[in-house]
């Protein structure tokens, strides 16, 4: 009877080995010593049946959360023991076992194997790998080296397993309650974004604040008709997209500010495309209505050119004419924001451990690392231990947007916190964990993971690897950013590219504009996994550096046809090839023999072409195809052969078919792939 190791079963069930060991011993009475212990397939099948499904796994992790936390906390101690050379008594196996991460240096591997570094380097050379003493090698290469020394290797589990399972925990519907919406303001420079934010803040500031002055922490809340709105005071789509590129989708509604006297400008178009790419609802604030040249109808007309039709004209985009200077229609704008957010039914569970995102962070001379956190779920309390990206800390003090010290903050509430070990990056996710020790060990594990991932190749989409990514199912559409020297070229390339879309793969131009390829374009491409195409323009120095850093492909052309053909070639490569049938040969059945435990063997004469072993065949009787299968065997006299040519006799059997009769014709054929030349 076959067996399975505990760690292999744990991988299948997506639970930590430690938890599975406890369950096996406590719940099922199966004696296991460690993750390398083996259990019978029957026991494994029963456990799979009982623990299958995410709900069961979540309950399992919740039940053994203490053990998980203990495992994470003891990770650092285990590392120290390994450095001292102490052996792990728990591995009572005949074969020696070592634990390594996704990558390891040659020196570290030699220490774990307890072998001289020179011997390990020689072994690597014999396996075809040239590596120096401090060079990193991947897990598969290390495994091959360990096999030479008869040592088993397994990949160690991430030490932040507890946090990952906490994040996967299902949310109870009855615990969800309404939360305030989070709003970001975007638009062209000098169109009044900051003035509008100031007008909103001054008109809705609470009387309890000293002098009505709000401390700048990167976000603030206002009260509208008894409802709370949270504004991110980080105007500009660059910050918005940079955070989205880090996986932080925190905005619920975007206010797009357009000057009534200026209309749609290049940065306005960028902001529109960024919002569309993020799939966030927009409300247009037509600002500067107090100016003499204000023309809101012109703004509405220009919006339609970018796919935004306002409600007045039969569309679904809300547009509100406002004036930040006179505060005209500010209340109406806020009511529209409230209405849009209500349509989304925004909810969160305030009773959970807090999770959220860093809005901004800085190093203060007197207070150390200071970060503005936006709580997205749960409630953050003073004294909580948190992990933020690859840093950690314990919250020593918390302040709201008015600078007042508070003890807790619920969903959608921004707070400034002190107590972090380092300054995190904007867009980093934070999670409350059991204690500071757990947070520290998780942060160390994350730093190690980041270091290892820096050695891995980028998996950004590119024209060259588009076909393989489609096959893997990782790309369903090709997103493109187009920059050109004139608007006519942008429109021509955009129209031509979008015509290339097929049922399998859609080409989507997420942004098109006039001018050099900028760092902002690269940021959007990184966030949307897009390719940047330039026509008669070049990337600036910052864009080149950003594209190399983020692994974004930038293609430049001088002929529109070349750009279209490159994309078309990549698209053709994505499509499944066409197949045509090629007949290999035919044979006539002249005798049949029935053999027990084998079936019917046919003796035949090859009429045309050749018969090839394992070829697809048709059995034809009186001109009618009666069966299709494969040649199971092919012999000439007593010898197995690969093929028999025309004019020779042979013996063969047809897979899963015994009703062969004299006079039947066997037609052998193959299906050849033909490269597609057009979409």
Curated annotation (Swiss-Prot):
Residues 233-236 are annotated as: G3. One of its GO terms (cellular component) is cytosol. It comes from Clostridium perfringens (strain SM101 / Type A). InterPro entries: EF-G-like_DII, EFTu-like_2, IF2_II, IF2_N, P-loop_NTPase, Small_GTP-bd, T_Tr_GTP-bd_dom, TF_IF2_bacterial-like. Its main location: cytoplasm. Gene3D superfamilies: 1.10.10.2480, P-loop containing nucleotide triphosphate hydrolases, Translation factors, Translation initiation factor IF- 2, domain 3. This is Translation initiation factor IF-2. Residues 287-290 are annotated as: G4. One of the essential components for the initiation of protein synthesis. Protects formylmethionyl-tRNA from spontaneous hydrolysis and promotes its binding to the 30S ribosomal subunits. Also involved in the hydrolysis of GTP during the formation of the 70S ribosomal complex. GO terms for molecular function: GTP binding; GTPase activity; translation initiation factor activity.
């Amino acid at each position: 009877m076959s067996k399975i190791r505990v760690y292999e079963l744990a991988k299948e069930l997506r639970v930590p080995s430690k938890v599975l060991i406890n369950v096996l011993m406590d719940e099922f009475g199966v004696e296991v010593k460690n993750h390398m212990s083996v259990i019978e397939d029957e026991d494994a099948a029963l456990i799979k049946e009982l623990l299958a499904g995410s709900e069961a796994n979540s309950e399992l992790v919740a039940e053994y959360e203490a053990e998980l936390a203990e495992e994470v906390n003891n990770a650092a101690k285990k590392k120290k023991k390994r450095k001292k050379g102490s052996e792990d008594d728990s591995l009572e196996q005949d074969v020696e076992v070592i634990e390594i991460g996704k990558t390891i240096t040659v020196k570290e591997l030699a220490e774990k194997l307890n072998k001289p570094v020179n011997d390990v380097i020689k072994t690597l050379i014999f396996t075809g790998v040239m590596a120096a003493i401090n060079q990193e090698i991947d897990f598969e290469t290390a495994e091959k080296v360990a096999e030479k020394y008869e040592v088993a290797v397994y990949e160690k589990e991430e030490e932040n397993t507890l946090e990952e399972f906490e994040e996967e925990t299902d949310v109870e519907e009855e615990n969800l309650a309404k939360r305030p919406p989070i709003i970001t303001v975007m638009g062209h420079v000098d169109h009044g974004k900051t003035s509008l934010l100031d007008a909103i803040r001054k008109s809705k500031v609470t009387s309890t604040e000293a002098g009505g002055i709000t401390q700048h922490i990167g976000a603030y809340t206002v009260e509208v008709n008894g409802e709370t709105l949270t504004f991110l005071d980080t105007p500009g789509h660059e910050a918005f997209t940079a955070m989205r590129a880090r996986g932080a989708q925190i905005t619920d509604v975007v206010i797009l500010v357009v000057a009534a006297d200026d209309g749609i400008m290049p940065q306005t178009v960028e902001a529109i495309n960024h919002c569309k790419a993020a799939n966030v609802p927009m409300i247009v604030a037509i600002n500067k209505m107090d100016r003499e040249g204000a023309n809101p109808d012109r703004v509405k007309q220009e919006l339609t050119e970018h796919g935004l039709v306002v409600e007045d004209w039969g569309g679904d985009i809300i547009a509100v004419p406002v004036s930040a200077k006179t505060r005209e229609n500010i209340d109406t704008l806020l009511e529209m924001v409230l209405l849009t957010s209500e349509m989304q039914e925004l909810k969160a569970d305030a009773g959970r451990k807090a999770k959220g995102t860093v809005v901004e962070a800085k190093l203060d001379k007197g207070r150390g690392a200071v970060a503005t956190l936006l709580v997205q779920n749960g409630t953050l309390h003073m004294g909580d231990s948190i992990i933020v990206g690859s840093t950690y800390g314990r919250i020593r003090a918390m302040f709201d947007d008015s600078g007042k010290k508070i003890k807790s903050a619920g969903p959608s509430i921004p707070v400034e916190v002190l107590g972090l070990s380092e300054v995190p990056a904007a867009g980093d996710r934070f999670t409350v964990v059991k204690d500071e020790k757990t947070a520290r060990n998780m942060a160390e594990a994350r730093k190690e993971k980041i270091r290892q991932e820096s050695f891995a190749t980028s998996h950004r989409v590119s024209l060259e690897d588009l076909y393989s990514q489609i096959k893997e199912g990782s790309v369903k559409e090709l997103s493109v950013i187009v920059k050109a020297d004139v608007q006519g070229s942008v429109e021509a390339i955009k129209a031509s590219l979008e015509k290339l879309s097929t049922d399998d793969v859609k080409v989507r131009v997420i942004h098109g504009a006039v001018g050099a390829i900028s760092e902002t374009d690269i940021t959007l491409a990184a966030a949307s996994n897009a390719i940047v195409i330039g026509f008669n323009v070049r990337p600036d120095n910052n864009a080149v550096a950003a594209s190399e850093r983020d692994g974004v492909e930038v293609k430049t052309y001088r002929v529109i046809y070349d750009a279209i053909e490159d994309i078309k070639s990549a698209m053709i490569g994505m499509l499944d090839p066409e197949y045509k049938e090629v007949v290999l040969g035919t044979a006539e059945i002249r005798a049949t023999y029935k053999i027990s435990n084998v079936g019917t063997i046919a003796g035949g004469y090859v009429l045309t072409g050749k018969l090839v072993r394992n070829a697809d065949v048709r059995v034809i009787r009186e001109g009618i195809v009666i069966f299709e299968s494969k040649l199971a065997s092919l012999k000439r006299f007593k010898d197995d052969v690969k093929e028999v040519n025309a004019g020779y006799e042979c013996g063969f059997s047809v897979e899963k078919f015994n009703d062969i009769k004299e006079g039947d014709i066997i037609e052998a054929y193959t299906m050849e792939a033909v490269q597609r030349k057009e979409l």
